């Protein structure tokens, strides 16, 4: 399931992070840090999506919910349970933020703050 996610949402998030680093003329270490950040962020996003599909409402999420379980699809919630999926998403968010290293709010100002906030948003979103 982790590999499948990496080919979908994860690839889009990694591309966005790495292309931004390239356009910003970041060095190899910064590009690697952003790529690793995006890998963790993409997986946390997918887990949050699985959680929303499990416990969200159509009004809140804006799309049909419960369809993965109805289709018998393997999700992070079905594999880890709801609490386990939440714990894994939180751990990935923390890991993503840790991977930023020199991109932290104190070191890189607004850019670092935005990336840290983005990681938090991914696991607290309700749609």
Mark where each language-model region is.
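All-alpha prenyltransferase/terpene-synthase fold signal
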Residues: 1-127
């Amino acid at each position: 399931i982790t590999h499948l996610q990496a080919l979908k949402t994860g690839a889009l998030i990694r591309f966005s992070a790495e292309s931004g680093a390239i356009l910003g003329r970041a060095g190899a270490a910064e590009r690697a840090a952003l790529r690793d950040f995006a890998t963790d962020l993409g997986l946390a996003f997918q887990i949050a999506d699985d959680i929303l599909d499990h416990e969200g409402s159509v009004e809140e999420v804006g799309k049909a919910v419960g369809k993965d379980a109805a289709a018998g699809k393997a999700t992070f919630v079905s594999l880890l349970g709801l609490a386990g999926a939440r714990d894994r998403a939180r751990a990935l968010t923390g890991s993503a933020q840790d991977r930023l290293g020199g991109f932290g709010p104190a070191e890189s100002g607004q850019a670092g703050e935005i990336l840290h906030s983005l990681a938090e948003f991914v696991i607290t979103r309700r749609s």
